[in-house]
Amino acid sequence: MSVFGKLFGAGGGKAGKGGPTPQEAIQRLRDTEEMLSKKQEFLEKKIEQELTAAKKHGTKNKRAALQALKRKKRYEKQLAQIDGTLSTIEFQREALENANTNTEVLKNMGYAAKAMKAAHDNMDIDKVDELMQDIADQQELAEEISTAISKPVGFGEEFDEDELMAELEELEQEELDKNLLEISGPETVPLPNVPSVALPSKPAKKKEEEDDDMKELENWAGSM
């Protein structure tokens, strides 16, 4: 079977339904490359053999040497043809692989686009705006509740702030005065001089009058 017959099918058989897949075509091209590479190795060996035969016969058997060189030329021609065919097949395989890669990429991108569209089917910009507004309202409400909970409660104890501030200022002033007094020390007050002579005692007459008054008081108390 020829190379192209193996590649495209022989005998005009029916192609598979829908044609071959890119993976199948790529695999066939690789198989063909492998077959041609083996053919190359075979021809290279034949060329080497014919060259050896031509050298062996040399001038001893000129006719055999010429025949060996002719076969060598035919093998070299076939080898050159196979080299060209391999280059073409490699180019085709690479192009098909790139096309298959692009197809897979586009297929996956389309699949992702459909998934994204399905995710957005039940969603529009108005609903998104409404949802974000609801979230903002709930956050604001949560902050108000947190503020209300954390605010101290007097439980009926109401005080005049101005009165409390005045009392606090008074206490601060007292503390300041006390500190200043401690820094400056107590003020020294001069004491009177001690008299150098004895003080006169009470007059005797005045003492007698006081004794009479005491007796009179005692008599009055005893008569009752």
Curated annotation (Swiss-Prot):
<dbReference type="GO" id="GO:0007080">
    <property type="term" value="P:mitotic metaphase chromosome alignment"/>
</dbReference>
<dbReference type="GO" id="GO:0071985">
    <property type="term" value="P:multivesicular body sorting pathway"/>
</dbReference>
<feature type="modified residue" description="Phosphoserine">
    <location>
        <position position="223"/>
    </location>
</feature>
<dbReference type="GO" id="GO:0006997">
    <property type="term" value="P:nucleus organization"/>
</dbReference>
<dbReference type="GO" id="GO:1901673">
    <property type="term" value="P:regulation of mitotic spindle assembly"/>
</dbReference>
<dbReference type="GO" id="GO:0000421">
    <property type="term" value="C:autophagosome membrane"/>
</dbReference>
<keyword id="KW-0653">Protein transport</keyword>
<dbReference type="GO" id="GO:0000776">
    <property type="term" value="C:kinetochore"/>
</dbReference>
<dbReference type="GO" id="GO:0051469">
    <property type="term" value="P:vesicle fusion with vacuole"/>
</dbReference>
<comment type="similarity">
    <text>Belongs to the SNF7 family.</text>
</comment>
<feature type="modified residue" description="N-acetylserine">
    <location>
        <position position="2"/>
    </location>
</feature>
<dbReference type="GO" id="GO:1902774">
    <property type="term" value="P:late endosome to lysosome transport"/>
</dbReference>
<feature type="region of interest" description="Disordered">
    <location>
        <begin position="1"/>
        <end position="23"/>
    </location>
</feature>
<dbReference type="InterPro" id="IPR005024">
    <property type="entry name" value="Snf7_fam"/>
</dbReference>
<dbReference type="GO" id="GO:0031468">
    <property type="term" value="P:nuclear membrane reassembly"/>
</dbReference>
<feature type="region of interest" description="Disordered">
    <location>
        <begin position="185"/>
        <end position="224"/>
    </location>
</feature>
<comment type="function">
    <text>Probable core component of the endosomal sorting required for transport complex III (ESCRT-III) which is involved in multivesicular bodies (MVBs) formation and sorting of endosomal cargo proteins into MVBs. MVBs contain intraluminal vesicles (ILVs) that are generated by invagination and scission from the limiting membrane of the endosome and mostly are delivered to lysosomes enabling degradation of membrane proteins, such as stimulated growth factor receptors, lysosomal enzymes and lipids. The MVB pathway appears to require the sequential function of ESCRT-O, -I,-II and -III complexes.</text>
</comment>
<dbReference type="GO" id="GO:0005886">
    <property type="term" value="C:plasma membrane"/>
</dbReference>
<keyword id="KW-0539">Nucleus</keyword>
<keyword id="KW-0813">Transport</keyword>
<dbReference type="GO" id="GO:0015031">
    <property type="term" value="P:protein transport"/>
</dbReference>
<dbReference type="GO" id="GO:0090148">
    <property type="term" value="P:membrane fission"/>
</dbReference>
<dbReference type="GO" id="GO:0061952">
    <property type="term" value="P:midbody abscission"/>
</dbReference>
<feature type="modified residue" description="N6-acetyllysine">
    <location>
        <position position="6"/>
    </location>
</feature>
<dbReference type="GO" id="GO:0005829">
    <property type="term" value="C:cytosol"/>
</dbReference>
<dbReference type="GO" id="GO:0001778">
    <property type="term" value="P:plasma membrane repair"/>
</dbReference>
<dbReference type="GO" id="GO:0000281">
    <property type="term" value="P:mitotic cytokinesis"/>
</dbReference>
<dbReference type="GO" id="GO:0039702">
    <property type="term" value="P:viral budding via host ESCRT complex"/>
</dbReference>
<keyword id="KW-0967">Endosome</keyword>
<keyword id="KW-0175">Coiled coil</keyword>
<dbReference type="GO" id="GO:0061763">
    <property type="term" value="P:multivesicular body-lysosome fusion"/>
</dbReference>
<dbReference type="GO" id="GO:0043162">
    <property type="term" value="P:ubiquitin-dependent protein catabolic process via the multivesicular body sorting pathway"/>
</dbReference>
<dbReference type="GO" id="GO:0005634">
    <property type="term" value="C:nucleus"/>
</dbReference>
<comment type="subunit">
    <text>Probable core component of the endosomal sorting required for transport complex III (ESCRT-III). ESCRT-III components are thought to multimerize to form a flat lattice on the perimeter membrane of the endosome. Several assembly forms of ESCRT-III may exist that interact and act sequentially. Interacts with CHMP6 and CHMP4C. Interacts with PDCD6IP; the interaction is direct. Interacts with VPS4A; the interaction is direct. Interacts with VPS4B; the interaction is direct. Interacts with CHMP7. Interacts with CFTR; the interaction requires misfolded CFTR. Interacts with PTPN23.</text>
</comment>
<dbReference type="GO" id="GO:0016020">
    <property type="term" value="C:membrane"/>
</dbReference>
<protein>
    <recommendedName>
        <fullName>Charged multivesicular body protein 4b</fullName>
    </recommendedName>
</protein>
<dbReference type="GO" id="GO:0032585">
    <property type="term" value="C:multivesicular body membrane"/>
</dbReference>
<dbReference type="GO" id="GO:0010506">
    <property type="term" value="P:regulation of autophagy"/>
</dbReference>
<keyword id="KW-0963">Cytoplasm</keyword>
<dbReference type="GO" id="GO:0036258">
    <property type="term" value="P:multivesicular body assembly"/>
</dbReference>
<dbReference type="GO" id="GO:1904930">
    <property type="term" value="C:amphisome membrane"/>
</dbReference>
<feature type="coiled-coil region">
    <location>
        <begin position="23"/>
        <end position="183"/>
    </location>
</feature>
